[in-house]
Every structure is written in C-alpha cells, then in structure tokens.
C-alpha cells in the first residue's frame, strides 16, 4: 500500500501549499502514482489546479486532487480509511492551524508529516509549539524542509546562528532536510506540467530523504 503524507505547519508564509503541489508533481514525474487531497479551508491548491485547467483544458492530469471541504470528522475518517487502502501515495495539504476539526483524523492516519519552515524566531517558536502537540499525540515521522532561504542573507553571521539554532532544536522532533533556496522557478510551477530541470534541481535534495522514507517504511 501507499503512504499518507501530510504537508503541515501552523505558521503561514512558509510555502506549505506550493511545496505540496511541487512534491506531488516531483513524485509523478519520477514514475510514482500519487493523489492529492486539499484539506485546507482556503483551498489554495485546488484553486491553483482549477486555474491551470482553465488555461490548459486539454492537458492530461499528472495527479488527481480532491478536497475535504464541508466534510465532518466522521466523513473524513471514512475517507482516510479508504485512502490508506490505495496502492499509491496520497499527499494532503493540511489546514494551517490546530483547531480544524478534521486535523486529528488526518494526523492520526499520516505516515509522514512534512513541515516547511523558515529559520526566523517567530517561525521556529510556532513550529516548536506545533511539534510538541503533534509528537505527543501522533506517530508520523516528521521532516522539516527549510524553504525559501535567501542564499546571500544566509551568509550573515546572525542568520547563520538562527539557522544553526533552528536545526539543532528541530532535530529533537524529526529530520531536517537540505534547504530550498528562494527562487521564482518554484513559485511559477504549474500543477499540470512536468517540473523543469531548474525546478527539479531546486527541490531534489530536500525531497530525497522524504522519498527514501516513502520507499522504506511508514510510521515510527
């Protein structure tokens, strides 16, 4: 059977939805069958696909996307039970909060939680709060993906210290992947088209540890 991968964080602006869509396309381009569920109230990824289809109505779909909008926790539990029986991976774009009534059901069924982050103190504090709650109740393996990192700023001493502090702290909760640089090639992705060479190169080192976990095992 496939795995359930949740893209999640309570801190906005870290690129959760974008990375979720790019990850799904990366898997599809690598020959893996994958489906996506948009569980976020804003439905950003679902609307992104809708816009892409309006501009390219004859394009084939590299992956299907469905939503949980309007679903009760009881309905979501049935959906998750069915998703876990599928022979391929399912990627879920989770709500950016801890109060959505469906989150407990999603998290309890997830094999992997991917948490995009920035190195700043506000993001780190919010992420640590999230991890304390998550690790206390759920068994999914956590991968932190430093995303949208500005290379020039990363060389400044105080930002290097922020980065080192973030990595050291988060290692207590999960795996910190190589970072993804801030780049327009990522934000310009299309949910229908294969990733360009530039896009693949931008994310491949960050995605490799997650894909290895998909291939090797599920929950801890």
Could you tell me what each predicted segment is?
Residues 125-139, 144:
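Conserved C-terminal guanine-recognition region of P-loop GTPase G domains, centered on the G4
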Residues 101-121:
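Inter-motif core of Ras-like GTPase G domains
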Residues 106-109, 134-139, 170-171:
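Short, conserved loop/helix-junction motifs that constitute active-site signature segments
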Residues 4, 8-14, 21, 25-92, ...:
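P-loop/Walker-type NTP enzyme "switch/lid" segment
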Residues 192-220:
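NTP-binding/hydrolysis catalytic cores, primarily Walker-type P-loop NTPases
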Residues 35-36, 92, 115, 143-146:
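Structural beta-sheet core signal
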Residues 148-196:
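Beta-strand-loop-alpha "switch" segments that mediate conformational coupling across diverse proteins
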């Amino acid at each position: 059977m496939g795995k359930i991968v949740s893209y999640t964080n309570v801190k906005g602006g870290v690129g959760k939805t974008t990375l979720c869509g790019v990850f799904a396309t990366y898997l599809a381009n690598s020959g893996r069958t994958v489906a996506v569920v948009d569980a976020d109230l804003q439905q950003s990824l679902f609307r992104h696909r809708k816009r892409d289809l309006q501009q390219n109505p004859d394009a084939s779909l590299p992956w299907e996307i469905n939503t949980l909008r309007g679903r009760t926790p009881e309905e979501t539990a049935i959906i998750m039970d069915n998703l876990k029986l599928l022979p391929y991976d399912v990627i879920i774009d989770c709500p950016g909060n801890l109060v959505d009534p469906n989150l407990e059901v999603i998290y309890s069924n997830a094999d992997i939680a991917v948490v995009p982050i920035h190195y700043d103190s506000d993001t780190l504090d919010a992420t640590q709060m999230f991890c304390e709650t998550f690790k206390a109740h759920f068994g999914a393996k956590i991968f932190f993906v430093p995303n949208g990192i500005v290379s020039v700023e990363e060389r400044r001493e105080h930002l290097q210290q922020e980065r080192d502090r973030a990595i050291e702290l988060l290692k207590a909760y999960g795996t910190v992947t190589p970072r993804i640089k801030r780049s327009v090639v990522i934000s310009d992705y299309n949910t229908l088209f294969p990733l360009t060479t530039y896009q693949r190169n931008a994310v491949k080192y960050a995605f490799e540890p997650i894909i290895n976990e998909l291939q090797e095992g599920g929950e801890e």
